[in-house]
Swiss-Prot record:
Residues 311-333, 411-469, 491-512, 528-548, 627-657 are annotated as: Disordered. It comes from Haloferax volcanii (strain ATCC 29605 / DSM 3757 / JCM 8879 / NBRC 14742 / NCIMB 2012 / VKM B-1768 / DS2). Exported by the Tat system. The position of the signal peptide cleavage has not been experimentally proven. Cleaved near the Pro-Gly-Phe (PGF) motif by the archaeosortase ArtA, which recognizes a tripartite structure consisting of a conserved PGF motif, followed by a transmembrane alpha helix domain and a cluster of basic residues. Residues 1-30 form the signal peptide. This is Probable cell surface fusion protein HVO_0405.
Length: 657
């Protein structure tokens, strides 16, 4: 078939009240009666869900543990088992930050932490689930890297290993824990070594007939034959990008590239035959200041691309299923971008965070047909959708939600038929007729790396909507441990915002209310005085800043450059810590730690959040720790000074400016 190109267009309209299809798919004739969930069961911390071979049992990764649910009666789900705080008998336990689980026969793999947790165990928990009601933990294979996602097949575990360097895919023997092999995109083309690891994070993997389909964010998706894991063989790549162009981007350009399409390969899966590959693209819009003083949003949520990989060396895109529209498509807004999905026969089951879940007929991948769509944006933010099993003349699929606000995370069951949702809600926050997302005509800069419209990029501060969870992170306000919130307004009152003091050199200071651990924190670091110049001031709650001197701009750029090189697991989800003040004259730098996937932004911050404690370490820059007491009293954070929060800058190496 001829390769088809699809142009994305995102407008101001929120989710339509009708079931009109979005660009890239068309609606089918509705099934009689409304399309709605058959049932739901609350599961604290719910993230990924996987279904047993008989379709009657669902295993849910639940952040602080895992749960087993019987769905043989889909209207009356039953919790068979729930295990919290595994490995709590270890000195560094418990095992936590658990976002992914996979099945290989009667063996369940639970992996983590999804994002680095200092001093906590990382690895693969092997669980015998031959009796789902009494899961038996039989082994723990420790790793030196966090594991955000994995795949299990034929006695092997395929692990994402974002080590901040080569970011390989690592293959383990499930029984012994021995490493069988590893592969990195740097092995395929050493030019990728010049690209910051955050731009080529290994986010997820799908294996079919021992061919690994590896999602590598802006490095695209690579198909690697791992029949012999010790000798990987690249078969082809989907939209791999140009490593030289990506390496040449400025820090601002890299930040923009990480958040907005194209690129952003997040999740991959194939159909039963392995010939049709789905690539889930996760992206957002960013607000850019134009030269004329106006602002606009560039980018927006992305969808699921369908690729013919019958010939892996020459993949062909057949179509793109576009995402639901969002009233605020920024990182801190209302997420409707693609997340995890599942193929079964000629059907595709997709999740779209607060955009809901959908069911498509993809028997003709050039013309996918939307069969059903259900959403509840005030209560549900869907992490995955998975086919379960046939019953009667229909069937069942399941979807896990991380919850929204006070609504609990949960596992939903849905009928496997076409239909319309009765009185579907919209995602519209405020009535508007103005477009929310535009794509300005690029005007190449002299370097070719930025456009005239991107002179400065800011995050909107008008919404208090919580963001979801990585999915690089510890968690946005009410959406659990996986939030990517960069807005300081979330969850804080105006009096909170006005009263937050800054940490300074010397003694510890209270720095931020933290009744919710995903709240944004602000720390001011003091460095030796630099060249004189006008301070850079930006209202930390979102107002515009005034001009910076060249010296202060240079200092800010150096801080940003260093931050970009840290925590790839956060960066790959577009998380962003913001340098809110950089004063070369006084040497003061204020960094707003936005809630990227790890709830702490892109700097050398590692976070630990198990509903009880948060530790963020700035060792490489300042020897300062920010801690929330683990007693459960999360009213404040404390800065404990090693060098008193001193920032050194020069050319001494990482962490120095």
């Amino acid at each position: 078939m001829d390769r088809r190109q699809f142009l994305r267009t995102v407008g101001a309209s929120a989710l339509a009240v009708s079931t009109a299809a979005v660009v890239g798919s068309r609606p089918a004739t509705a099934h009689p009666g409304p399309f709605e969930p058959l049932g739901r069961i609350d599961i604290d911390g719910a993230k990924e869900a996987v279904v047993s071979a008989d379709g009657e049992t669902v295993f849910v990764a639940a952040t602080s543990g895992y749960a087993v649910v019987d769905i043989s009666a889909p209207e009356r789900q039953e919790l068979l088992a729930e295990r919290r705080d595994p490995l709590s008998d270890r000195e560094d336990g418990p095992f936590r930050g658990l976002y992914d689980a996979k099945l290989d026969g009667d063996t369940l793999l639970v992996v983590g932490p999804a994002n680095p947790i200092p001093g906590a165990p990382a690895g693969v928990l092997v669980v015998d689930v031959s009796d789902p009601a009494t899961p038996e933990e039989i082994a723990f294979h420790e790793t030196e890297f966090p594991i955000h996602n994995c795949f299990a097949a034929d006695g092997r575990a395929y692990l994402t290993a974002n080590d901040g360097d080569r970011n390989p895919l690592v293959v383990l023997d499930i029984d012994s824990g021995d490493e069988l092999g590893r592969w990195s995109v740097v092995d395929a083309d050493d030019r990728w070594a010049d690209v910051p690891p955050s731009m080529r994070s290994v986010h997820d993997v799908w294996v079919h007939d021992r061919v690994a389909h590896v999602a590598l964010w802006d490095a695209g998706t690579w198909l690697v034959d791992l029949s012999d894991p010790a000798s990987p063989w690249v078969l082809g790549a989907v939209s791999p990008g140009d490593p030289e162009e990506i390496a040449a981007l400025t820090p601002r350009g890299r930040n923009r590239e990480r958040r907005t399409p194209p690129g952003n390969h997040h999740y991959v899966a194939t159909d039963d035959a392995g010939d049709l590959l789905g690539v889930g693209v996760e992206s957002w819009a960013i607000e850019v200041d134009r030269d004329d003083g106006t602002t606009e949003l560039v980018g927006g949520p992305s969808g699921v691309e369908l690729w013919d990989v019958t010939d892996p060396a020459n993949p062909e895109r057949r179509s793109t299923i576009e995402p639901p529209a969002s009233p605020d498509p920024t990182l801190g807004g209302v997420w409707t971008t693609a997340h995890n999905f599942d193929f079964r026969d000629d059907r595709l089951y997709t999740s779209w965070y607060r955009g809901g879940v959908k069911r498509h007929d993809v028997s003709d991948p050039t013309d996918p047909v939307e069969l059903a769509w259900w959403r509840d944006p005030e209560r549900a933010s869907f992490w995955t959708a998975q086919y379960a099993y046939p019953f009667a003349d229909e069937g069942v699929f399941v979807a896990s939600s991380r919850g929204v606000g006070d609504a609990s995370p949960a596992l939903y069951t849905f009928p496997d038929h076409a239909g319309d949702q009765r009185d579907p809600p919209t995602l519209r926050a405020e009535p508007t007729t103005e477009p929310l997302v535009n794509t300005p005509t690029p005007t190449p800069s002299p370097s070719g790396n930025e456009t005239a419209a991107s002179a400065s990029e800011t995050e909107s501060s008008t919404s208090t909507t919580d963001a979801p969870g990585f999915g690089l992170g510890v968690g946005a306000a009410a959406l659990g441990v996986a939030g990517w919130l960069v807005r300081v307004t979330s969850g804080a009152t105006e009096s909170d915002r006005r009263s937050r003091p800054r940490a300074s050199t010397g003694t510890p200071h209270r720095v931020v209310p933290a009744s919710n651990l995903s709240r944004t924190t602000e720390i001011a670091f003091l460095s030796p005085a630099g060249a004189s110049g006008e301070p850079f001031h930006s209202n930390p709650w979102g107002s515009k800043h005034r001009s910076m001197s060249d010296e202060s701009e240079s200092l800010k750029e150096r801080v940003e450059t260093w931050m970009v090189g840290q925590m790839p697991i956060i960066q790959m989800h577009g998380g962003n810590s913001v340098v809110r003040k950089a004063d070369a004259e006084s040497g003061e730098v204020v960094v707003e730690l936005g809630g990227a996937c790890a709830g702490c932004g892109i700097s050398n911050i590692t976070a630990q959040n198990i509903q009880s404690d948060l530790i963020m370490t700035f060792d490489e820059i300042t020897d300062v720790q920010v801690k929330v007491p683990s007693s459960g009293d999360h009213g404040s954070s404390t800065v404990e000074g090693g060098r008193g929060g001193e920032l050194q800058y020069g050319d001494e190496g990482p962490g120095h400016f």
